């Protein structure tokens, strides 16, 4: 393929069908050759230009076949095609310009033209307008945006001039109005994506820091200054040479991703979906290594490109604004700082190269003045220029380290860290943070990059400090005031994931980094040990709460022994809450809040009472009964009634549930006689979606499986299930559930009524629902793993199941257990993105632990049911 593509169908071919039959393979041939050159690493700017020129020839050839030379019509490329850029599967946007008489006269010829182009395989998007109609349509700035980049394909000088005049500023959209409209459009577009590019499946084109941001800057420059590209603004003083070069470099990075994505997807796909990420990474040459997957490297490069584009575009938008509005009189703040139109400006000419003290002073001023809108563009640019010369903390002097700690202890510390991270200063001061900036993990559990997750954790800590966490974190506001030094929690949050991607245990490696940082910044040995311990153990509370039975005193004793002190417990609890809630917007819920609070209070009590002599079982039973009795008495129940209900409840019940749960269960049992079935449901936490379902029933084959299948059909996700043997051959089933699907209405009364109806029927007819696996989950399949161990002193068998998550998973597992004639005594459900990690305590139908042969039969049945292959 030459730089001026010569491939074109024979213009002498008589029939349109024959002409299209010649043109189609030629277009395919062009794309194949461009793909080959793409794989060879040719610049994307050249490839998209070559494809546009190849399509130009087809367009002109088709025009000459269909439209008379004296038609009075002209053909113009608009939009991206007008810029001379065509990605492999992009639309081909064209404008036919001519007066209304010419449009009507040649209506059939135009229809023939567009049909012919579609037949060739070109995704044509067309408009037919007169100059006056162009002026009217351009009242919509999106239409104007497409027209200002028009390029004549078949048009004389008069037609080109007519189009230019129709959309000139005196007619529509003066430059200042256009700038404001495009800026508002950009901000609104960013909001649609959560104002971050750090999504699991980012949009290369329209997402924050994407190609559309660069195009927006170009449109503004074209309308305001009449220049075709941002490089031309360097000479006008609006853009620095380094900024223009950086934007050009990052544009090439994103354009290469987009070009490859179109090839891999074979459609105009703009989102880096999981469907394509791995294939695209392989095509671009990103290889796996022991520390990172190739796809993670590719995504990190994307996130870093998007972040840099956002930083520079923010500066340019501010400069464009100043160009229209003019500079305001500076408002001195002292120390070489001032406010200019609400932006913080520094006398950067007096900054020595690499003077980190001046940089830290800048952030201190920013934190001290809430009215600051942001950094002045010239100051932000100066900061970017000195960034590479700033020392890391390891080689900085003691004064600089003291200034950093002052920022950490000062007002709005989390905002300051966020700003430092966004502007690259934090990564320069702590190189390990720069290493994880933009780093993603190829799974569905971590929905943010490591640096973005870290900042989300710090943001949650700031909520604790501001007292605004009560709604989502039930006891954080009680724990926060007890912290001796809040900055230690910030440091633990900053370092807890800083070693991800190095290989090895990131908690241990991060603890080494945290200790070195604390010692370098002259923290006391006690403070250093606390931060180091928090980083090393930051997962411990979450794992204990979600994967172990925290109603078991041995579990609490082990956890409390590990923690050792009330101070460590307070810090670890807050770090754990902030960490889980900062991992994914959907991960934190009322159930996890209560679970962690229960573990916190149980550990706090164990520490208070002493770890050497934990209370015996009989004492714990007595305390639980008395606490529940007090609650029931307050509700008006007499002791005779209370004793009768307590007698119908298994002892283990009093060790597994909180007093208010016991009181609710006992009060509910007043309504039922022996041999009857009772179903009750309530909100586990007032004003929250979490529900607690209590089922009292004669023991029946398939009871647990039927309840689980019904909850699944109604759209509820089960987080915990407990099955206890009660007197008179009855069963206590207690489920903690949350609405998981949109059709789960969250009404406890309706849910209880549905379960009553199901349990009144034939349980053997209740089957799990069949639902499709969501698209994202399909790309994270792995073979299930089933492990067995003893529990409850050897009286039960514990199953640990790790499998790809999917709708109805627990219902299918329950069905398998039923078909194997096994009894479920406890179920703990945990989902981590695409991974379901569930634990069950079971026995055979005679209440005995499973034999080796029964274990193997169950393993085979579960793997056959859950294996994604």
Curated annotation (Swiss-Prot):
What this protein catalyses is:
[protein-PII]-L-tyrosine + UTP = [protein-PII]-uridylyl-L-tyrosine + diphosphate; [protein-PII]-uridylyl-L-tyrosine + H2O = [protein-PII]-L-tyrosine + UMP + H(+)
What keywords were assigned to this record? Hydrolase, Magnesium, Multifunctional enzyme, Nucleotidyltransferase, Repeat, Transferase
Q: Which SMART domains does the entry link to?
A: HDc (SM00471)
Sequence segments annotated as region (Uridylyltransferase): 1-332
**A Pfam family it matches:** NTP_transf_2
Q: From its record, what is one biological process in GO terms?
A: regulation of nitrogen utilization
Q: Source organism's superkingdom?
A: Bacteria
Supply the Gene3D superfamilies for this chain. 3.30.70.260, cca-adding enzyme, domain 2
| SUPFAM superfamilies, sorted | ACT-like, HD-domain/PDEase-like, Nucleotidyltransferase, Nucleotidyltransferase substrate binding subunit/domain
InterPro entries listed in its UniProt record = ACT-like_dom_sf, ACT_dom, HD/PDEase_dom, HD_domain, NT_sf, PII_UdlTrfase/GS_AdlTrfase, Polymerase_NTP_transf_dom, UTase/UR
Domain called ACT: residue spans: 692-774, 798-869
* MF (Gene Ontology): [protein-PII] uridylyltransferase activity; phosphoric diester hydrolase activity
Function comment: Modifies, by uridylylation and deuridylylation, the PII regulatory proteins (GlnB and homologs), in response to the nitrogen status of the cell that GlnD senses through the glutamine level. Under low glutamine levels, catalyzes the conversion of the PII proteins and UTP to PII-UMP and PPi, while under higher glutamine levels, GlnD hydrolyzes PII-UMP to PII and UMP (deuridylylation). Thus, controls uridylylation state and activity of the PII proteins, and plays an important role in the regulation of nitrogen assimilation and metabolism.
Q: What is this protein called?
A: Bifunctional uridylyltransferase/uridylyl-removing enzyme
Q: What is the lineage of its organism?
A: Bacteria, Pseudomonadati, Pseudomonadota, Gammaproteobacteria, Lysobacterales
